[in-house]
């Protein structure tokens, strides 16, 4: 069983779907989102509202964490300035705070938008070069 798991983006589409099953896999689930609330909490879950673009809010979240599921990001194609904080700086802050606090494992969800502009008939493999289809895809490349 995972001792302490940090879930970023807990109020988003993927995070809200995974909260319950993840709560069954760990002793303590620390859920975070930029939203001020995410609804009812599971018995071993605590919620901390935080802005991933602010390192001083992310660093304490990773203290004593065994594993991070990093799903916190803006998932829409928007102008670069709208994605810079949450997707680029936020992801950097998660990885850097994990490094500083010796977190051993991070699970990250990428996107087909990172690989991007290939024909539907091309087989995509781990060695396929990135061709992001926009700033959202570029943010996924950056985090990978």
Identify the role of each PLM range.
Residues 26-38:
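Conserved glycine-rich Rossmann-like NAD(P)H-binding loop of the short-chain dehydrogenase/reductase
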Residues 36-44, 60:
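Short loop/helix-cap segments at secondary-structure boundaries that form the rim of catalytic
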Residues 8, 32, 68-71, 106-112:
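SDR active-site strand-loop-helix element
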Residues 68, 79-106:
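NAD(P)-cofactor binding segment of oxidoreductase domains
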Residues 93-135:
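Conserved Rossmann-fold NAD(P)-dependent oxidoreductase catalytic core, especially the SDR/UDP-sugar
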Residues 50-86:
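NAD(P)H-binding glycine-rich loop region in Rossmannoid oxidoreductase-like domains
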